[in-house]
Amino acid sequence: YRETEWERDRNMYGWGNNKGLVLMKSWDLVNWKRANTRFDQLTAGLSEIGCAWAPEIAYDERVGKLMIYYTMRFRNERNKLYYVYVNDDFDRIESLPQLLYEYPDETVSAIDGDITKVGDKYHLFYVAHDGQPGIKQAVSDRISGDYEYDPRWYDFEPKSCEAPTVWKRLGEDKWVLMYDVYSITPHNFAFTETSDFITFKNLGRFNEGVMKSTNFNAPKHGAVVHLTTEEADKLEAYWLKNKRKYVSTASIQRNPLFPGYYADPEILYSEQTQKYYVYPTTDGIPG
């Protein structure tokens, strides 16, 4: 419990306080191994990072290593995209963060990167905080840098959106770009479809177009992975057998002047008695 909005001074470090990432690995999508990593402990030069978040995983074919790319900023400076390499066991960072992409305008942040390889090109979709936040694309011949800026907006949203992610339709040369429309209530996802990463068709939002939600609402910062039929069946069978019930509780923190139910207090100070007097309203029920 703390009395300040953030753990560190907001003017100096901005919102958030996340200095690392959680790495998790599984062979069956049920049992997971976890490792915590801290960027600020890798070197003294990273001790003053403001926040690190929105990680994604890719494989760098040129160096033969798993690569994590993510959003990070130093202190309360603008946000940029960085990458690191991790070991084969996926429990330890093996390199210092390197710059993956920064917005050409030095006053604008770039966050929430998502990379898709098509042919010999790497397509980086990201959020540009250039006016109203939205989705832009940059393309490179290599996964770890040299992305060429494209000024075009690739979302169809009149509202702010973030967290782009791309997946390929099975059996088709079509890709779907999904993004989080966080600026509406309740939150929703919106979708576009492309076959060439130049022209995009607007598919609308969940339940407002061809995409339908099932057992969820108000989704947030999502991602999509392909499953085989066997994998999907195993997951369904496991969770039908191992249903979980979550019960949340909240601690009640009070600092009452006196017990009972009172409201609308007025406090007066008496010069004659040199005491303070409280005059509240009451429901008439003691205790």
Residue ranges and their predicted role:
Residues 1-287:
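Carbohydrate-active catalytic/glycan-binding domains of CAZyme proteins
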